Amino acid sequence: MYAGGDLTHTSSPSAAAALKARKSVSGPVTATAKIGSWMGTPVAVVTAGDDVTLAVGPTWKVVGGWWPSLGVTKPSLGGGPRWVLAIGSDARKGQPLERTRADVLQVIGIDGKGGGGVMGMARDLWVPLSTGGKGKINSAMVAGGPKAQVSTVKQVTGLPVKGYVVLGFTGFKKIVDEQGGIPIVIPKTVVASHAKNMVIKAGAQTLSGAQALAYARERKTLPDGDFGRSRHQGEVILAAAVKAKLAGPIAIPAALTSFSKVGKSNLTAEQILTFTAGLHQLSPLKVGRGVAKGAFGWAGKQSIVILGAEARSLFAEFRDGNLS
């Protein structure tokens, strides 16, 4: 690649196109590589100075990156905007991860220009389901799995969500602890009623897996209930993204390996590698958060949330992949 050789058979079309105008380098190039796996497929990140190359095995095809030393000023990361649905499964011990209600629904978007957003979907939103009929938005996964959950979110929001990642409670805690916790600033003290009244104090701190889960799941003690809970989930996701950005792209393979051990996804290795690398290109000032809200109502004996104009405005705002 650095010597100017033909990349037609060793790169994805988008990466090959980006590197077509590269300037070759004479002499040795010193690089560092880290290897991991995504759902059984080998992945690698190679860094050489400010250059970053993303590759997918087993034949090690270059699928993206950025190469300022070669005169390639624009990152090749699959384009944008793109969205992925992060699902937190309510599965308990012995229950299938992908066929229980979704406890967390967060749409993560990047615009391909250094901006992005995280949009929460409250569990009680009463919407048309991709599996038929109407119901609470998180029930789609019970009837049709994560793909049905994605389809429901797509038809409600109008966003062409690419795919999903799913984690359970235990898996979430394990990943957070393996990564050394999540540094975050908690705006207001929270008492997690569902977690033996665990207290998450206000201020800057690093949350353990158990603390992060308690903060992300608490609803009953919050003045805005499920909306506040969804907001907290977005805060945790953004805090994790900031930590990942500070660790640098070289840490991506280890993170993907950790997730693959406990989570599920329909994203290919190329899709997840370029998407997570895209998160490293984000500017914190160009990333926003939002929660799809609505009016409270009833469907029989069920308490529900009915989407209103504010939520539809949020969906429209997110169509460029940016909520800042």
Where are these regions (language model features)?
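Non-catalytic, solvent-exposed segments at the cell envelope interface
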Residues: M1-S324
